[in-house]
A protein has these predicted regions:
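Flexible, non-catalytic linker and terminal segments flanking ANL/adenylate-forming cores
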Residues: 1-20
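Conserved AMP-binding/adenylate-forming core of the ANL superfamily
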Residues: 17-19, 28, 36-81, 85-89, ...
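Conserved AMP-binding A3 loop
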Residues: 48-50, 198-225, 234
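Structural core segment of the AMP-binding/adenylate-forming
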Residues: 65-66, 93-180
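Conserved AMP-binding
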Residues: 78-81, 102, 265, 269
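Short hydrophobic alpha-helical segments of the AMP-binding
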Residues: 84-92, 98, 220, 227
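Conserved short alpha-helical elements in the N-terminal third of ANL/AMP-binding
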Residues: 90-94, 231, 239, 257
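Conserved pre-ATP/AMP-binding loop-to-beta segment of ANL
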Residues: 166-173, 180-202, 209, 235-266
Length: 269
């Protein structure tokens, strides 16, 4: 086998470490190591790793109280915003499967993806709700949860006017209320990373009807580790429930892993 690495570039690892853990363990690790560091900056508002972890715990508890169980599909139809991250990690902690739905989809495509995925829970934006409101009755959606950007960033301006929160339609649940009304106590869900689905993401449909690509927790964690290697400069080092980085092949437990946390600036698109 070693002969295959004869011309291997110097400094490039021959193998990477892929821990068998649920995706949300990445967030839990960051919240433990850098609770005070910003995870997200959005138009001047800041959300730390600890806050993101706790808010997603609350949302997981909220989903569980609404009847969402392991393996259920939850569609997120949102632009970039802090609530997207909270909802994403929260639904995974509840054992549900993430179905990303682009805000750019036309009604026909929107209805197809919700039906094809079997998403019974829909999370959308109040400002973009007119199209979904007229067609959700043609989908499996039983629970409708709306997000308002006014809750996270009141000074946001649209058309030179302050963005204000309007009352939601009858029967629609308020994302902010759900999070605030539940404790940070997610349900105890056993995840088998190599078997349990985490995402059903749809292809672009350039050659036909979009297909739902099924990704396990392990698939997504592996992808994160690969990105961490190429952009962070080291292999993922997972010990004692924490993610770190090792820079040299052969680093053993005696080498303290470098711990780092980064922040993400979100722009609504």
């Amino acid at each position: 086998m070693e002969k295959n690495f004869k011309c291997w570039p110097k400094g490039i690892f021959k193998n990477l470490s892929y821990p068998e853990v649920p995706i949300y363990q990445i967030l839990r690790s960051a919240a433990t190591q850098w609770p005070w560091r910003n995870a997200i900056i959005f138009g001047g508002s800041e959300l730390t790793y600890q806050e993101l972890d706790q808010l997603s715990d609350r949302f997981a508890a909220a989903l569980h109280s609404l009847g969402v169980r392991k393996g259920d599909r939850v569609a997120i139809h949102l632009p970039n915003c802090p609530q997207f991250a909270i909802a994403y990690f929260g639904l995974l902690k509840a054992g549900a499967i993430f179905v990303p739905v682009s805000p750019l989809l036309a009604e026909r495509e929107f209805v197809f993806q919700l039906n094809d995925s079997g998403a019974e829970t829909y999370i959308g934006l109040d400002l973009l709700f007119s199209m979904p409101q007229g067609c959700l009755d043609r989908t499996p959606a039983k629970r409708v949860i709306l997000v308002s950007l006014a809750d996270v960033y009141p000074p946001l301006y649209a058309s030179a006017k302050p963005l204000s929160k309007q009352p939601f339609p009858e029967g629609v649940l308020d994302f902010t209320d759900l999070v605030s009304q539940h404790p940070p106590e997610p349900p105890a869900v056993q995840i088998e990373p190599k078997k349990d689905l985490a995402h059903i993401a749809y292809t672009g449909g350039t050659t036909g009807t979009p297909k739902g690509v099924m990704l396990t927790h392990y698939n997504v964690v592996v992808n994160c580790c690969q990105f961490a290697y190429w952009f962070g400069g080291g292999d993922v080092d997972y010990r004692d429930g924490k993610f770190g980085v090792r820079y040299e092949e052969g680093d053993g437990p005696e080498n303290h892993p470098a711990r780092r946390g980064m922040e993400v600036s979100l722009i609504v698109v």
